[in-house]
Amino acid sequence: GGRLEQDGEWHCEYDGDGNLTERYLGTGKWLDGKKDRWRYRWNADGSLAKVVRPDKREVEFTYDALGRRLSKSFGTTVTRWMWNGNVPLHQWKQRREYSVMEDRWNTDTERRDMTVWLFDEESFVPVAMIKEGRSYSILTDQLGTPTEAYDAEGNEVWSRVLDMDGNVIEETGNKGMVPFLFQGQYYDCETGLAYNRFRYYSPKMGMYVSQDPIRLTGRILNLYGYVCNTTYLCDPFGLVYQSHNHGDVNDSVTILRRQNIRNYQIEVHVDSHGPHIHLDRGTRQERYINISGMSNEQALRELPNKLRRESSVSAAINNALNY
C-alpha cells in the first residue's frame, strides 16, 4: 500500500507488482489525454530497465547480479561504473556506438572523463573525487549528504542545498559535479530519479517508485516510503532505514531507564520505529509518544510542564533524537 496515484495535476499508473509505469499531466481520459508523459519499464527482477521521457528519448540501465548499476545509456553516450564493494569507484563515459578496434578503456576521451570516487571507510559518505588528474574534497552534513566541494587550492567549486525530500533548493559552481543525494543515492538528471541500489527514489514525489522488495521487513508501513526523518535517518540500499550514527536499529535501545520523576514513570528508548517516550502515571494514564521527526523542543511539549524542566529528561530526548 501507500502508492501515490495523484500529485496535484500529475497522475500515476502502476503495474501488478506495484511498479510505477506512467506519470503524466491530465487525467488520461479521451478529451484530457496524457501530457508530459513519463513511462517506466521494469525487468523481471524488479530493477528499472528503461525510462521513456516526454521528449521520447530513452534512458536505459544495466546491472550486475548484486543489483549494482553498471551502465546508463542516453542518446549517444553510455556512462559506466566499476564498484568497490557497495560504493562506486570508477565512472566514465563512452560513445554508444564504439568500434571493436578501439581500446574502450584507454581512449584519450575516456581517460580525461574518468572520475574516481572516494568514500569514508565502510560507509556511503563521499569524501573526495579525482577527475582529469585533479583532486577535490567533498564536505557533507551530519547525515553524510554532500553540501560543498573544494579544489586542492581550497577554492569552493561546488555547493548545494537540498530540501527534506532531496530536491535542490540552491546549487552553485559546477552544477551536477557531485551527483549523490542522501547516502547511497546517485541522482540522474536525465530521469529526475535517484538510483538507490535496489530501488529508485523520486525527490519530486518524496518516495520510491516501486515497493520495498523486503516488504514490511523494511519497518515502514508505506511500502513506497523513504525514512520518516531525513535529518538523522537514511536508507543506503533502498531496503531498510538506518540511524546515521549506529546503522540498523533492530532491538529496543534504552536511553533513559524507567524511573519515577515527579510522580511519573518515564522511559525514553529507540527501536525500529524510531525514538519513543513511555509515560505512565498509573491505571489508564499510560502513553507511548513517538517523537520521530520532532525537535527537542517539540518533543518536550508532549510532556507535562513539571517534566519539561527536568534536565535528565531533556538530555535523554535529545540523545534519542540524535541516536
What are these regions (language model features)?
Residues Y14, W42, V52, Y63, ...:
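Hydrophobic alpha-helical segments, especially N-terminal targeting/anchoring helices
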Residues D15, T62, W81-N84, S99-T107, ...:
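Short amphipathic beta-strand/extended segments with alternating polar/hydrophobic composition
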Residues V209-Q211:
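A structural motif specific to WD40 beta-propellers
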